[in-house]
């Protein structure tokens, strides 16, 4: 969590330099960008992140195998629903069943309950995006096949099975099929799922921050009352001691009674002070302070999650535009059915292949990082709750 927070903090500070800045400031900006890149790489090397990614990829492999082994075709909506529910039960930590049982056993704050609900919804959006990435990889196989066959056509290679004309016809057919495919990311980007989740999380973050401040004010007020009570106790005992001394000194036995009364009052005052110290120690971790800790952890986790979702939204939009551009090129080439247009399209695909792969990989890495952030914050809040009840 600390590495992820440091990485996000550095990322928020790393904006492009404005015009007119000195060379020294530009060098500092470049150094800052390099350090951000190192922190970026370090965040993806942590064991917890690697465990989350391995767990998700293993489940994706199991799900893909089960889909391939399924003999009877089923509607896409039902298959997506089964994938979604099974994947949620497998990856979300702590699972929802554990939280439901905890909510029945103990009374949780409404904001904490909302935090768990919204983090689960954010995980749902990430799972939907993960499904889209898997479909993008499947669709991209058509472009890979087109580039492979097109390379042979452009080089003038001849085969016994197919003539160059048949290979071109096969390429145009593959491009036409690719252009007819739906862009998987359009469903997320156009329906503004990220924006809906972002607004809900931002609203919760505002409420968590406000409640955290109120709890801190209450804790300060209670501490002030304790100090005021302690001072009042000292003043009261001092007044009693002075009164007893005056009475004792005006009596016949004042000389003998004064030391005894003074010692007795001092002893009582000391015992009261020790009892007060023990009471202050036992009440240090009060229910209010523990609730404040839960609210604070939930607010920090929500802040990081909002930044992660914003990053995912930008990366998904960028990749969505790249896919739409490829579909446009494929549609133009399939419609023209000219070898010159085909060669230009192949140059376009080959020239942007590395860029496309980098964008896909970066989005996938941030997606698994978001999974890790969700589970990490949920575990930390749950640890505070169970520590309170135990």
From Swiss-Prot:
Domain of life: Eukaryota
Pfam entry (one): DUF677
Transmembrane segments: 228-248, 250-270
UniProt keyword list: Membrane, Transmembrane, Transmembrane helix
Chief localisation class: membrane
Membrane topology reported for the UniProt record: Multi-pass membrane protein
GO cellular component: membrane
Keyword Transmembrane: yes
Subcellular localization: Membrane
Keyword check for Transmembrane helix: yes
Family indicated by similarity: Belongs to the UPF0496 family.
Matching PANTHER family: UPF0496 PROTEIN 2-RELATED, UPF0496 PROTEIN 3-RELATED
Protein name from the UniProt record: UPF0496 protein At1g20180
Provenance organism: Arabidopsis thaliana
